[in-house]
């Protein structure tokens, strides 16, 4: 049982990766993106759960 708890915590921690995105001003800024989320490259940090760009959604 402890192994399953450890495994789920490890998977949760490794599900996030650090990415660097460049905004329109050319400034690099770090953002977090879920692995395998399927967000388009033009909006990696404002992607809705459906995988489409959503300017009002911060995800």
From Swiss-Prot:
Location of Isoleucine amide modifications: 58
Span of the signal peptide:
1-19
GO terms, molecular function: toxin activity
| Principal location | secreted
Q: Summarize what the UniProt record says about post-translational modification.
A: Contains 2 disulfide bonds.
- GO-annotated cellular components: extracellular region
Keyword terms of this UniProt record: Amidation, Cleavage on pair of basic residues, Disulfide bond, Neurotoxin, Secreted, Signal, Toxin
Q: Which residues form the propeptide?
A: 20-36
Expression by tissue, per the entry, reads: Expressed by the venom duct.
| Subcellular location as annotated | Secreted
> Can you quote the domain comment?
The cysteine framework is XIV (C-C-C-C).
Which named protein is this?
Conotoxin Cl14.4
The record lists the organism as Californiconus californicus
């Amino acid at each position: 049982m402890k192994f399953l708890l450890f495994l789920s915590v490890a998977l949760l921690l490794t599900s996030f990766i650090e990415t660097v995105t460049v905004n329109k001003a050319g400034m690099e800024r770090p953002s977090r993106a879920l692995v395998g989320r399927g967000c388009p490259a033009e909006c990696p940090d404002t992607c809705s759960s459906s995988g489409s760009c959503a300017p009002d959604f911060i995800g």
